[in-house]
Amino acid sequence: MDMDLNNRLTEDETLEQAYDIFLELAADNLDPADVLLFNLQFEERGGAELFDPAEDWQEHVDFDLNPDFFAEVVIGLADSEDGEINDVFARILLCREKDHKLCHIIWRE
C-alpha cells in the first residue's frame, strides 16, 4: 500500500468519519437496548476519542498499522461529561489516507 502523508484525514475528519460509520452500522451490530441507551445518553455522556491503534488489532488485520496512517476511534459513554469513555460500544480502526478507504470495527458484545 503506497500512502501519502500529505493526503491524510485530519484528526477531526477521522473522528467524524468514524462516528458516521458507527451511526450507520450500530443498529445492525449492537443489541437494541444498547442502541437505545447510547442514543438517550450520548448528548450528556457520549464521546468519540482518537488513539493510535492498540496492539490487539494485529489479531484482526494482517498489515502494518503505522500510526501515521491508521487511527483507532473509541465510541461510547463516560461517567461524566469530561470523563474518559469507560462504556465502549465500538472500537473503529480507520485508515487516514484519503485514497485508501479501510475500516474494521470491534463491536460491544
Swiss-Prot record:
InterPro entries in the record: dsDNA_mimic_put (IPR007376), Put_dsDNA_mimic_sf (IPR036763)
Name of a matching Pfam family: DUF440
Function: May act as a double-stranded DNA (dsDNA) mimic. Probably regulates the activity of a dsDNA-binding protein.
Family of this protein: Belongs to the putative dsDNA mimic protein family.
Name this polypeptide is given: Putative double-stranded DNA mimic protein YciU
Gene that this sequence comes from: yciU
